C-alpha cells in the first residue's frame, strides 16, 4: 500500500507540473497576443495578469472570486484585466472581466462596485482596445 501511495502522489505531482507548464505557456501566448490591451488612462493603469498566480493573488487581495476565472482567461474565452492606480501599479484596486468586446464587470474590494470615474476610464480603454484589436487581427 505504501508503494501505491508514493506512486499516486508522484503521479499527482507530475500532473500538477504539467498543468502549471501548460498554463504558463497559455499565459505567455496571451500576453504576446494582447499586449496592446495594456495602457494608462486618466491615471489608471490597465494591466494583464502575467501568470495564473497573479489572478489568484488578485482575488485574495480584493476578497472576490476572480481566482475561479483562471482557466477561462488562459483559454482566451475571457480577458481578465487589473486596473491599478498609475502611481501604485503593484497595489490591487479593481478587476475587470472583458468578453466578446464588452466589459462584463468591474469589481473592487469585497465585490463592491468601483467609482464612476473607473467605469469612464474603462469605457475609454474598451474603445481603444477595439480599435487597436482590429489593427492586430
Regions found by a protein language model. Give the residues of each.
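Catalytic-core elements of nucleic-acid end-processing and repair enzymes
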Residues: 1-137
